UniProtKB/Swiss-Prot annotation:
Source lineage: Eukaryota, Metazoa, Chordata, Craniata, Vertebrata
PROSITE patterns: DISINTEGRIN_1 (PS00427), DISINTEGRIN_2 (PS50214)
Endpoints of the signal sequence: 1-20
Residue ranges of domain Disintegrin in the record: 47-112
GO molecular function: toxin activity
Renumbered ranges of motif Cell attachment site: 89-91
Keyword Disulfide bond attached: yes
Pro-peptide positions on chain: 21-47
Family indicated by similarity: Belongs to the disintegrin family. Dimeric disintegrin subfamily.
Source organism of this protein record: Bitis gabonica (Gaboon adder)
Record's GO cellular component terms: extracellular region
PANTHER family on file: ADAM A DISINTEGRIN AND METALLOPROTEASE DOMAIN, ADAM METALLOPROTEASE
Protein name: Disintegrin gabonin-2
Length: 128
């Protein structure tokens, strides 16, 4: 129970996770973090053990780690700039990681419409 509380607190400290809601997804060991228009599924057992990227005492990324979660965060590090984080039907309009944030910023060349976007993120772990 304390580990679950620490993970929830850690998620609430970071702006990217600030609006998160943690929901139990049926299986006691599976949880989901829900963002506006985004759903990230945590690995089985993630809520039952300390998050590998989060210092449970300070609720911040551990020393040497960049991030805890997000479409541009893998293994506690930001993905390289230019990594596709959201694919569209037209290659030139994909969304790319910046290399300095866990977020997936919208391609500035896109219009307001999302008609050309696929229904899931490029990584398959985040639905947008």
């Amino acid at each position: 129970m304390i580990q679950v509380l620490l993970v929830i607190i850690c998620l609430a400290v970071f702006p990217y996770q600030g609006s998160s809601i943690i929901l139990e997804s049926g299986n006691v060991n599976d949880y989901e973090i829900v963002y506006p228009k985004k759903v990230t599924v945590l690995p089985t057992g993630a809520m039952n053990s300390a998050h590998p990227c989060c210092d449970p005492v300070t609720c911040k990324p551990k020393r040497g780690e960049h991030c805890i979660s997000g479409p541009c965060c893998r293994n506690c590090k930001f993905l390289n700039a230019g990594t596709i984080c959201k694919k569209t039907m037209l290659d030139g309009l994909n969304d790319y990681c910046t290399g300095v944030t866990p977020d997936c910023p919208r391609n500035p060349n896109k219009g307001e419409s999302d008609e050309l976007e696929w229904s899931a993120a490029a990584t398959g772990s985040v639905l947008m």
